[in-house]
């Protein structure tokens, strides 16, 4: 189990630059969270995860070149120590099931309050699961 004594190093992958910028802004205002890399597609996410070894990868589900589900499977096969938090607009049960079966540690809706997303990042970093309360 990891502790929160040092910054949580986050990779942020979403194909929408405006979404990445907004998430980056509130994550970096939070104590002990640092966005170390950003990707605008799934293949770039895999490359940057391998290169930077983040503590947590935040992935959108629908991205070009590889989906968040595909990237999650890749992480579990190649970078097991990286926590995966899927941050998406999809609240359908089949997506939630597919993401969790792929090995994600958390699933949070983009409509969640920034504090909830920050809490989910911290939960995933410390080895806990993080599920959006609106999905339950």
At which residue positions do the language-model features occur?
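Acidic catalytic/metal-coordinating carboxylates
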Residues: 41-44, 65-70
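The short loop immediately C-terminal to the conserved phospho-acceptor aspartate in CheY-like receiver
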Residues: 55-57, 61-62
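Short, flexible helix-to-coil linker/hinge segments that flank and couple to helix-turn-helix
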Residues: 94-101, 105-136
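Conserved sequence signature across two-component system core domains
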Residues: 13-14, 39, 57
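Short amphipathic alpha-helix used as the core "switch/output" element in two-component signaling
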Residues: 47, 69-81
């Amino acid at each position: 189990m990891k502790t929160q004594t040092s910054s949580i190093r986050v990779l942020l992958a979403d194909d929408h630059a405006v979404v990445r910028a907004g998430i980056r802004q509130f994550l970096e205002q939070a104590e002990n969270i640092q966005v170390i890399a950003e990707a605008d597609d799934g293949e770039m996410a895999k490359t940057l995860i391998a290169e930077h070894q983040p503590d947590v990868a935040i992935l959108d589900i629908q991205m070009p070149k590889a989906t968040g589900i595909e990237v999650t499977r890749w992480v579990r096969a190649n970078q097991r120590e990286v926590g995966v938090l899927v941050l998406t607009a999809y609240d359908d049960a089949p997506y939630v099931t597919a993401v969790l079966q792929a090995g994600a540690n958390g699933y949070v809706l983009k409509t969640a309050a920034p504090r909830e997303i920050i809490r989910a990042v911290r939960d995933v970093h410390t080895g806990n699961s993080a599920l959006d309360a609106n999905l339950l």
